[in-house]
């Protein structure tokens, strides 16, 4: 970084400030993680200089012989990691991966089914503000009002009624394991393609800690960060080589130009890391830590959507906090996601407000707080520390108007950050 400090001290200073923020805060956004120094090095390499439109061995530019080897390595490792027959490592993001699938399989006006965003779905699964909700006729399914788990009776009824061409499973705020076989049965009954978006759980899937959708779904998409702990990017997988050819064309030239080969190198490194036994241990720890945090919060009387978690994330139903604040006579007894998000920021915990199923609050206020364990697990924290974090969060939420309590919480967070340093090699 010395050359950057000399050439552009303003950008260097801002990067250092962001590094310090990451070091001094407990990162609990479920979709974030800390990638390895090796991935950082690959992304910051001379590969960023090279244009490489096309696929390995089929480029539109010369000088791609080493680029081809790197991209093919990423492809081969991705296929091995997930047991896929075909992989495309070029999508710039998970959203780009999903768009390419739509381009390959659908025509404008076709019907698609995806989970309602407020129940844990994703913008790219048919939200009206996203291109997926503008180009296609969208039918949303959700969770059961009692169990807060996927309502498969509703999914089947809607599928039979609307006959979608594509059914999407996989979510951004769903704390339970996904029954891909049940979705396959419904998709077959109505003749629909089945897409699994495993952006949040890819690392757990790759290590056998969540069922693998590749053998059951027509297409699988994912991001390469989150639980996979790679660079920010996308990935498309399929068990069908012929379908893979259509997907490749939908990526290039269908929806992208030149691939980001420095990021693809980072993906190759991350996939290689994920193939090591230590990564399977990491994934198991992610789940154990999430369950330790969930138990700690529940013991303090905080309700979790669906009653807990099977994966790396959980949703706090903050109405349970509001009920306690009202009983104790708090000046402001309403704890919303927006308010909780800001409180977490004050004590240096990074989280995000989130809607919960059947949420009475608007999305920008929300009644939920989403927490995840991947980043802090990477940092080395274990179940004991996650239980302590649960206590810190509960103290903060139940005493939001006590400056002394908030300061004590912030100091406890600072102590944890000092015990588990982040990127010490970066100076």
UniProtKB/Swiss-Prot annotation:
Gene3D superfamilies tied to this protein: Aspartate Aminotransferase, domain 1 (3.90.1150.10), Type I PLP-dependent aspartate aminotransferase-like (Major domain) (3.40.640.10)
Keywords, comma-separated and alphabetical: Amino-acid biosynthesis, Cytoplasm, One-carbon metabolism, Pyridoxal phosphate, Transferase
Subcellular location: Cytoplasm
Pfam families membership: SHMT (PF00464)
EC number(s) on file: 2.1.2.1
InterPro entries reported in the protein's UniProt record: PyrdxlP-dep_Trfase, PyrdxlP-dep_Trfase_major, PyrdxlP-dep_Trfase_small, Ser_HO-MeTrfase, Ser_HO-MeTrfase-like, Ser_HO-MeTrfase_PLP_BS, SHMT-like_dom
Cofactor requirement: pyridoxal 5'-phosphate
Keyword Kinase attached: no
Example GO molecular function: glycine hydroxymethyltransferase activity
Annotated positions of the N6-(pyridoxal phosphate)lysine modification: 226
Claim: Transmembrane is one of the keywords in the record: no
Disulfide bonds: none
Pathway the protein takes part in: One-carbon metabolism; tetrahydrofolate interconversion; Amino-acid biosynthesis; glycine biosynthesis; glycine from L-serine: step 1/1
Assigned protein family: Belongs to the SHMT family.
Function: Catalyzes the reversible interconversion of serine and glycine with tetrahydrofolate (THF) serving as the one-carbon carrier. This reaction serves as the major source of one-carbon groups required for the biosynthesis of purines, thymidylate, methionine, and other important biomolecules. Also exhibits THF-independent aldolase activity toward beta-hydroxyamino acids, producing glycine and aldehydes, via a retro-aldol mechanism.
Name of this chain's protein: Serine hydroxymethyltransferase
Lineage: Bacteria, Bacillati, Cyanobacteriota, Cyanophyceae, Synechococcales
